[in-house]
């Protein structure tokens, strides 16, 4: 409830846009540490007195600076309110370090407390009510539980909904959840200290002496990260590579795969047009 209250308080504020976000990601156990270089811009038609960013409430800000100067800010849950006015068209570079554990309670604030905590409640896709305020649900036969993020030595899964990186867009529109809003940001991600594990994210992957990095030729609306002991099978069609990651020993699906590599390439080419 407190996260909804905090978000509604600043819902009508004009927002900045994050043009670029360069991140260096590390983790130890269930704790993560991120150093982020951001470029903010005010594209609105008026000055913004207190630019707002959003970050998972379980992640504490170690430092927040701009061009070597500490910036004052207030924080209410996942809402970070900076005490620094931005004029129309102004760009503001930020250097932010944050660390901690992921608080999954920030995910899917549009769900009622009953739906969020009911482990037998499943959300029906594409079935929002006519007003767009709440998704419809069904009662499942089995109790599947609900996890929206995981950070650990064996496996890590971080989706945009858990606010594992700084965003200028709130995680959900509480008035009308079906209305999605995104920033298109130039993301660059470097993951350190995960030797021997598969590191999966959006973009072009490169290995270096520190770890694995991902860069993108075009701005993206959001970013995910998955780390774990995965095996991979790939096929290349017209210089475009397709890959499947799976748990070790779980390649049973390959035995029933009767298409040759050449036939599979033709099938993919036909689908791509």
Question: Which functions belong to the PLM regions below?
Answer:
Residues 1-31, 145, 179:
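N-terminal, polar/Ser/Thr-rich
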Residues 18-25, 77-82, 171-176:
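Short structured motifs
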Residues 98-223:
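Extended, low-hydrophobicity, Ser/Thr/Pro/Gly-biased non-transmembrane segments
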Residues 33-35:
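Short, solvent-exposed loop/turn segments enriched in Ser/Thr/Gly
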Residues 47-48, 58-125:
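A surface-exposed beta-strand-loop module
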């Amino acid at each position: 409830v407190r996260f909804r209250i905090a978000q509604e308080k600043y819902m009508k504020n004009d927002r900045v846009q994050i043009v670029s976000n360069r991140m260096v990601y590390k983790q130890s156990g269930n704790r993560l540490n991120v150093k982020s270089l951001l470029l903010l811009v005010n594209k609105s038609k008026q000055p913004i007195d207190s630019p707002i960013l959003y970050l998972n409430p379980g992640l504490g800000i170690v430092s927040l600076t701009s061009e070597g100067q500490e910036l004052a800010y207030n924080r209410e849950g996942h809402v970070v309110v900076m005490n620094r006015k931005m004029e129309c068209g102004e760009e503001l570079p930020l250097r932010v370090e944050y660390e901690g554990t992921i608080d999954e309670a920030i995910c899917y604030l549009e769900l009622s407390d009953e739906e969020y905590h009911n482990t037998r409640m499943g959300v029906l896709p594409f079935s929002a009510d006519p007003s767009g305020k709440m998704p419809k649900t069904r009662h499942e036969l089995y109790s599947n539980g609900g996890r929206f993020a995981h950070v650990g030595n064996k496996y890590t899964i971080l989706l945009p909904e858990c606010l594992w990186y700084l965003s200028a867009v709130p995680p959900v529109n509480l008035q009308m959840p079906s209305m999605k809003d995104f920033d298109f940001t130039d993301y660059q991600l470097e993951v350190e200290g995960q030797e021997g594990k598969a590191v999966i994210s959006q973009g072009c992957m490169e290995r270096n002496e520190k770890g694995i990095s991902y860069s993108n030729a075009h701005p993206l609306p959001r970013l995910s990260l998955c780390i774990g002991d995965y095996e991979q099978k790939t096929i290349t069609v017209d210089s475009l590579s397709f890959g499947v990651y799976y748990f070790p020993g779980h390649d049973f699906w390959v035995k029933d795969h009767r298409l040759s590599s050449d036939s599979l390439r033709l099938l993919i080419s036909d689908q791509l047009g």
